[in-house]
């Protein structure tokens, strides 16, 4: 990833004007609206950090949560912190800025991290679906299959594939000539706005990028769907109502996160976006990049007794230390 920190301006110097920065319009409005948005996103960011940080701390400190399911959940919370950090801090700076400018290299760095972390999230959701499938459909074999070592390999696989998939296509996109307007009507550097500003068409690069993104979305979503079909079939065969409720409580929260994330991502990157208003595109991007990390702690702890107890112990322990 180190080559992303060098000058990423296009190699084609024949153009009369080379873009050295982009203007992110974000959410335009009067000063009062900007202050409201700044306060709103700052609160969302702090709550996201606190909520997901609490999950990480609870999983790390509570021996009862040292299981594959909570190990994956802790890593997922860590991922959510990085994912939301790829967008909101720059949004906050952009809201207060008069120029709304982001450097050329900074724009493509954000582009890289945003898509790499998004891909990692897709893979994590698939791995978590696999974990729930094994736990409910094959409970006897689960401890032998989902060992700590195997779980660590799955987590490493998600991070490696997520971050090794986009350096080359994004590097080639950064080498396209950007010699005209530099205004991006978005709050982040995304594929469609950047390609619209390029002075030369790049159908092959664009095709490779979208094919790669679509394949990740398709295969992970199909795997999750298959896992839940098998899982729900097994749940409905459980004779006791209490057993069915327990099974639903362990997988229901994951299903909510999957639906929220994939539903908005597919509207943005699988269906054509040229007919979608710009404001709606921004809102959809906010849902899967900001709202999902915010509600992740609430969704995963709402019906999970072990996690609620662990978080309660964390808060209780903090109060004791403050009073002592």
Curated annotation (Swiss-Prot):
Glycosylation sites: 12
Organism: Homo sapiens (Human)
Broad class of the protein's primary localization: membrane
CDD domains to which the protein is assigned, alphabetical: 7tmA_OR11G-like
InterPro entries in alphabetical order: GPCR_Rhodpsn (IPR000276), GPCR_Rhodpsn_7TM (IPR017452), Olfact_rcpt (IPR000725), Olfactory_GPCR1 (IPR050939)
TM stretches of this protein: 36-56, 65-85, 110-130, 150-170, 208-227, 248-268, 282-302
Pfam families: 7tm_4
Residues on Cytoplasmic side: 57-64, 131-149, 228-247, 303-324
UniProt keyword terms in alphabetical order: Cell membrane, Disulfide bond, G-protein coupled receptor, Glycoprotein, Membrane, Olfaction, Receptor, Sensory transduction, Transducer, Transmembrane, Transmembrane helix
Compartments where found: Cell membrane
Any GO MF annotation of the entry: G protein-coupled receptor activity
Top-rank taxon: Eukaryota
Function comment: Odorant receptor.
Bilayer topology term: Multi-pass membrane protein
Family statement: Belongs to the G-protein coupled receptor 1 family.
Topology, Extracellular side: 1-35, 86-109, 171-207, 269-281
Record's protein name: Olfactory receptor 11H4
Residue pairs linked by disulfide bridges in the UniProt entry: 107-199
Record keyword Transmembrane helix present: yes
Xref: Gene3D superfamilies: Rhodopsin 7-helix transmembrane proteins
Gene: OR11H4
CC terms in the record's Gene Ontology section: plasma membrane
